[in-house]
């Protein structure tokens, strides 16, 4: 997709022809546009990527085209470029994880596996590294053991070069005189460790704080967001995404004026309040096929603050408020320059079992809406040093197969098979997210378990599974049927090793489903 960028010519900047045709870099090729196209492109770029014009002075539209009418110009001014070394990222590790239960019964939300071999925490971490941001704080709270283990294995084991940066894990603690040790909200989580951040600022030239969530799937260059923040001289910048009618009430919704300044923020509105937050999203027609299907602009829970503004809000102005979205931001926009950055690429909030399942299944589509595969902006995860997957007479269609699996005469369709998974003969997996295993069982161990009437890790012979999430280290026996043929929407059967959420069967971590079981 080709974009046009608007650059202002300020002060003594001049337009002088340099050369024509295909010579020079894209940044040197400037094409004079008519006033209508400039106005359109200027508005789009201001709201999406932050390039701003001025009231006075010539306007030029940057394009990647090189044609006979293309005029190359050089200007005598420089933009104030954002420096990733002046940015510190804070990744919120989530609360109790009730929305993703039972996947969060023994782990924090950011530690939930996704895409076969990744964890949710890998998304913001990798986006930070790919954006050049290497000063990162991760705030953990409930069930954080596996999250801490993954962070240390992946990011603190020497595999990634931080140069002068660092990754610090900050676990919820209770200070003397405090009534509660747990984080009471997103803002309270940052406030609890404001002393750590302040101490860090004394030794590092940090000007901007990037607040991130640990339960979303997207690929973003955070420095484009920070650049708009700098260009607008904003106190706070919200990253926003267009959303449809069906899910709009799940998010904080925003309205902004023609300059990109946020003028209204409503947290999870319903009824007439929801209707009042509708906006004209036609300016996104360059990125979305039918913007009318997405009449709302939702806050992604990704924020950039000026350092001093954040400290003042948390320590003084709103010292008693606990949440950014529902409490602080709606008040702050009346007192501060709060800007919107519209992110029109793929973004999925992994807030429920249904959204988690759908996001994983979408990875199997051809072509997928989101790709983990990108050599320029890779996603990092724990190095496991596993051998390639071995398959024997299998039928596999539209599936993702992770490392170190053993597949024998099975059928896999529109499913994700996680690391170290074992599927035996005549078993069928369809529309299923199988997370895999933490360890291998040897052939001798498997034979012994079968001889004792027990179930090995993996999926047994002649088992049929559809519309299911199978958590780590689950043992599914032979001749099992998991299809939820009765269409049950909600059910709690922990004693039998499974739950049903939104019609999706969730097999628990370390659970055993005995031979012949029908779910």
Swiss-Prot record:
Tell me, what is an example of a GO biological process annotation in this record?
A: starch biosynthetic process
GO MF? ATP binding; glucose-1-phosphate adenylyltransferase activity
InterPro entries registered for this protein in UniProt: ADP-Glc_PPase, ADP_Glu_pyroP_CS, NTP_transferase_dom, Nucleotide-diphossugar_trans, Trimer_LpxA-like_sf
Assigned EC number: 2.7.7.27
Coiled-coil zones:
none
Tissue specificity as recorded in UniProt: Expressed in stems.
What subcellular compartments does it reside in? Plastid, Chloroplast
Pathway where this protein functions? Glycan biosynthesis; starch biosynthesis
Q: What domain of life does the UniProt record list for this protein's source?
A: Eukaryota
- Short name of one Pfam family: LbH_GLGC
**Top EC class, one word:** transferase
Biological function: Involved in synthesis of starch. Catalyzes the synthesis of ADP-glucose, a molecule that serves as an activated glycosyl donor for alpha-1,4-glucan synthesis. Essential for starch synthesis in leaf chloroplasts.
Record-stated family: Belongs to the bacterial/plant glucose-1-phosphate adenylyltransferase family.
Name recorded for this polypeptide: Glucose-1-phosphate adenylyltransferase large subunit 3, chloroplastic/amyloplastic
Q: Which organism is it from?
A: Oryza sativa subsp. japonica (Rice)
């Amino acid at each position: 997709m080709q974009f046009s960028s608007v650059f202002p010519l300020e002060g003594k900047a001049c337009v002088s022809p340099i050369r024509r045709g295909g010579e020079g870099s894209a940044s040197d090729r400037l094409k004079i546009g008519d006033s209508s196209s400039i106005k359109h492109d200027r508005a789009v770029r201001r709201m999406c990527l932050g390039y701003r014009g001025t009231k006075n002075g010539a306007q030029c539209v940057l394009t990647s085209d090189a044609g006979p009418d293309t005029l190359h110009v050089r200007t005598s001014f420089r933009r104030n470029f954002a420096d990733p070394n002046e940015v510190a990222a804070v990744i919120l590790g989530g609360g109790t994880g009730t929305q993703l239960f039972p996947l969060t019964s023994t782990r924090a939300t950011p530690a939930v596996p996704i895409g076969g071999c990744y964890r949710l925490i890998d998304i913001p971490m990798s986006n930070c590294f790919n954006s050049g941001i290497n000063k990162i704080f991760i705030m953990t709270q409930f069930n954080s053991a596996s999250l801490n283990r993954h962070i240390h294995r992946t990011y603190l084991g020497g595999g990634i070069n931080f140069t002068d940066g660092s990754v610090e894990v900050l676990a919820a603690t209770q200070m003397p005189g405090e009534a509660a040790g747990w984080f009471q909200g997103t803002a309270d989580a940052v406030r609890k460790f404001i002393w750590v951040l302040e101490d860090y600022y004394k030794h590092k030239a940090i000007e901007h704080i990037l607040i991130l969530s640990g339960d979303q799937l997207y690929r973003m260059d955070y420095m484009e967001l920070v650049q708009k923040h700098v260009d607008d001289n904003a106190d706070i910048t919200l990253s926003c995404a267009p959303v449809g009618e069906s899910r709009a009430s799940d998010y904080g919704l925003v309205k902004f004026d023609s300059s990109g300044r946020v003028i209204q923020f409503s947290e999870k509105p319903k009824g007439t309040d929801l209707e009042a937050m509708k906006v004209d999203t036609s300016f996104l027609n360059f990125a979305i096929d039918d913007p009318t299907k997405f009449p709302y602009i939702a806050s992604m829970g990704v924020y950039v603050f000026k350092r001093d503004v954040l400290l003042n809000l948390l320590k003084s102005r709103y010292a008693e408020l606990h949440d950014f979205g529902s409490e602080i931001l709606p008040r702050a926009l009346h007192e501060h320059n709060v800007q919107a950055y519209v992110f029109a690429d793929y973004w999925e909030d992994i807030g429920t079992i249904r959204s988690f399942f759908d996001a994983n299944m979408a990875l199997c589509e051809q072509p997928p809406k989101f790709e983990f595969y990108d050599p320029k902006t890779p996603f990092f995860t724990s190095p496991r040093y596993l051998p390639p997957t071995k398959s024997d007479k299998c039928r596999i269609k539209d599936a993702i197969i992770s490392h170190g699996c053993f597949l024998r005469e099975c059928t896999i369709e529109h499913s994700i098979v996680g690391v170290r998974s074992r599927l035996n003969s005549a078993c069928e997996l369809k529309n299923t997210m199988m997370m895999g295993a933490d360890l291998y069982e040897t052939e001798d161990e498997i034979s012994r378990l079968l001889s004792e009437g027990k179930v090995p890790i993996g999926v047994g012979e002649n088992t049929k599974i559809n519309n299911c999430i199978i958590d780590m280290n689950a043992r599914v026996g032979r001749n099992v049927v998991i299809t939820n043929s009765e269409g049950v929407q909600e059910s709690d059967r922990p004693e039998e090793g499974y739950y049903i959420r939104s019609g999706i069967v969730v097999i628990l971590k370390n659970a055993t489903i005995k031979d012949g079981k029908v779910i």
